[in-house]
Amino acid sequence: MGRLILEHTLQGHKGRIWGVAWHPKGNVFASCGEDKAIRIWSLTGNTWSTKTILSDGHKRTIREIRWSPCGQYLASASFDATTAIWSKSSGEFECNATLEGHENEVKSVSWSRSGGLLATCSRDKSVWIWEVAGDDEFECAAVLNPHTQDVKRVVWHPTKDILASASYDNTIKMFAEEPIDNDWDCTATLTSHTSTVWGIDFDADGERLVSCSDDTTIKIWRAYHPGNTAGVATPDQQTVWKCVCTVSGQHSRAIYDVSWCKLTGLIATACGDDGIRIFKESSDSKPDEPTFEQITAEEGAHDQDVNSVQWNPVVAGQLISCSDDGTIKIWKVTE
């Protein structure tokens, strides 16, 4: 069995902390929350400390933050219905663009693998795709409305310009750009959860997706492409996503976030029961019927709901979490 070892407990935000995001280099992270501020943290020696506080970009709670793949830009999604784009081009972080268009709270933001596209989603049930048109210029490329309820999360595929979204309507949607007319279309709807889908994340090569839900389960989905050896039908030559594994019984309340480590293959969950749990694929797992087992858990990882977990993209086994209790924690996971 593995271990979840607490390395650092950090404070600074006032109120609940909604999101944390590692910089691509893994030596810096950003956090955001109820206090309308973004904090940029870095490691000096063995001490994490706040280097910058960005407090003038939003008028309400900041729900999520994400670094661009190049690490030069930071996007923040807020309940004030805007998304802010920050950069450090002048030496200090500045808000260089504010993206407007959503009618209600923006819940999530995500950069594509190239950094050339940005996706946002909102309580207004829509998903927006933005093109980075140049220096600090963003153009709306698509407004997508296939969900029937609040959209909780958007995540780009790690190797292709494919977008996944998760919603209060219990579904996950996949989007891709049609090569002929350049229109963005919903290419797949993933149904199996029986309540809100809070979080989604791709594995390292993007052939599988993990989702977590209010129904207290996590599910593993696999992509079946046209001509697949499993014999799964692919109507209209479109990739089909099938639920190949459901992990249940470990969580007692809603699972708010899930992160699939691109370095180790481990899956971490953030739960409303204050716990963090780590799952590993079994050694005898089959591609079309994989099995995942819980290798370690910290039942009282935080004093209140755990809102976000994210694996460090560079340091294998390092995990960050944040909570309604106003703390950020950095963990070391051993197998």
From Swiss-Prot:
InterPro entries: CIAO1/Cia1, G-protein_beta_WD-40_rep, WD40/YVTN_repeat-like_dom_sf, WD40_repeat_CS, WD40_repeat_dom_sf, WD40_rpt
A cellular component term, taken from the record's GO annotations: cytosolic [4Fe-4S] assembly targeting complex
SMART domains assigned: WD40
Record key words, sorted: Repeat, Ubl conjugation, WD repeat
PTM characteristics: Conjugated to URM1, a ubiquitin-like protein.
Any one Gene Ontology BP term: iron-sulfur cluster assembly
First and last residues of every WD repeat: 12-51, 57-96, 101-140, 146-185, 192-231, 250-289, 301-335
Function per UniProt: Essential component of the cytosolic iron-sulfur (Fe/S) protein assembly machinery. Required for the maturation of extramitochondrial Fe/S proteins.
Protein family (similarity comment): Belongs to the WD repeat CIA1 family.
HAMAP family xrefs: ciao1
Name of this chain's protein: Probable cytosolic iron-sulfur protein assembly protein Ciao1
Lineage summary: Eukaryota, Metazoa, Ecdysozoa, Arthropoda, Hexapoda
Gene for this chain: Ciao1
